[in-house]
């Protein structure tokens, strides 16, 4: 029978790049919509919700996707990753609720934080299925999911905010959008992958369970936690490093200034998404080169990745220097452009 043939690294990168470009563009579009339909305070509330939930979710995710995609020797089944992710996500949501109440956030702000936490929980489950597709270099299907999620999220946020005039209904639309993509596309990706490998006469060891059900074997879960815990801690610290300025900014100056800061800073986030797409596409190939002791191919690919990332960074700096103020005026509002100095 024919063996499974992965799509080329170039096509994987193309799919991932296009998917992440559309998704990051739509995320940026959410800030634009809130800036156009609302005000900087509304942008600030949304940003605060992301800032409060991010460290908790980053820690609870334990970077399982990276471990999953680089598990070239299949030490764990997909079901193990899914089982652990459900446990950690189930623990993260009450922690977000406790932080929201303990820090004194009330009313609209508290509701937005909790809703964003729930949306991030749904996203974390999708992330395990993305890891499965990425591990087997099926980036096209993962990219399609992201390309559907981005525009649908933007549409639902826009409709909810426009009709109600409140960010709460906009964020609720975001939750609905992410739940729909998880149920109609991401979860069925497991069966799609099984069917694809079955038709090609090859079932990888990582899909040995044949069902997309979580597996909770205490010994396996414990080993996976100890393996991934350092990565989770590092990602939490990275998230805190990025978000602590937002906490202090909101506390000392208010949500308006936080909203302006978020709008300006998102241009950097958009650039990081492109670099992330590059790394995501190449990571499984790098892992195989490393596991196969192919040092020459590993170093060549790594050098190419670094060169592309540097070129993208320099391009972003040039655009900001030449037309930063004009871009902010057109995309957001004139009041945002005065902060370019």
Which ranges hold each PLM region?
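Interhelical loop/hinge segments that connect adjacent transmembrane helices in multipass membrane
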Residues: 1-5, 9, 140, 144, ...
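Signature of the first transmembrane helix
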Residues: 8-62, 93, 150-154, 226-255, ...
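Helix-loop interface residues and adjacent transmembrane-helix termini in multi-pass membrane transporters
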Residues: 37-40, 75, 106, 136, ...
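Helix-loop junctions and terminal segments of transmembrane helices
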Residues: 57-76, 135, 264-293, 299-305
């Amino acid at each position: 029978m024919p063996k499974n043939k992965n799509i080329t690294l170039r096509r994987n990168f193309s799919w991932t790049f296009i998917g992440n470009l559309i998704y990051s563009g739509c995320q940026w579009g959410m800030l634009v919509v809130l800036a156009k339909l609302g005000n900087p305070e509304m942008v600030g509330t949304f940003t605060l919700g992301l800032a409060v939930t991010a460290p908790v979710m980053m820690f609870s995710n334990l970077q399982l996707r990276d471990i999953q995609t680089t598990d070239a020797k299949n030490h764990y089944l997909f079901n193990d990753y899914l089982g652990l992710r459900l446990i950690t996500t189930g623990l993260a949501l009450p922690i977000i609720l406790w932080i929201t109440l303990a820090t004194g956030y009330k009313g609209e702000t508290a509701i937005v934080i909790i809703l964003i936490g729930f949306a991030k929980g749904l996203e974390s489950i999708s992330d395990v299925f993305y890891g499965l597709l990425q591990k087997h270099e099926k980036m096209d299907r993962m990219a399609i999911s992201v390309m559907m999620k981005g525009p649908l999220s933007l549409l639902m946020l826009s409709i909810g905010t426009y009709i109600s005039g409140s960010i709460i209904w906009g964020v609720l639309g975001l939750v609905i959008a992410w739940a729909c993509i998880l149920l109609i596309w991401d979860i069925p990706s497991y069966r799609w992958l099984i069917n694809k490998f079955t038709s090609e006469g090859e079932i990888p060891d990582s899909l040995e369970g044949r069902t997309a059900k979580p597996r909770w074997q205490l010994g396996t879960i414990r080993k996976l936690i100890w393996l991934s815990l350092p990565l989770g801690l590092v990602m939490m610290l990275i998230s805190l490093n990025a978000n602590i300025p937002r906490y202090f900014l909101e506390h000392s100056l208010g949500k308006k200034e936080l909203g302006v800061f978020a709008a300006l800073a998102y241009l950097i986030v958009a650039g990081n998404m492109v670099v992330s797409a590059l790394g995501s596409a190449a990571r499984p190939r790098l892992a195989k080169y490393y596991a196969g002791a192919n040092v020459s191919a590993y170093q060549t690919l790594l050098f190419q990745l670094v060169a592309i990332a540097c070129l993208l960074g320099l391009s972003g700096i040039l655009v900001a220097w030449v037309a930063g103020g004009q871009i902010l005026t057109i995309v957001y509002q004139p009041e945002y452009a005065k902060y370019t100095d």
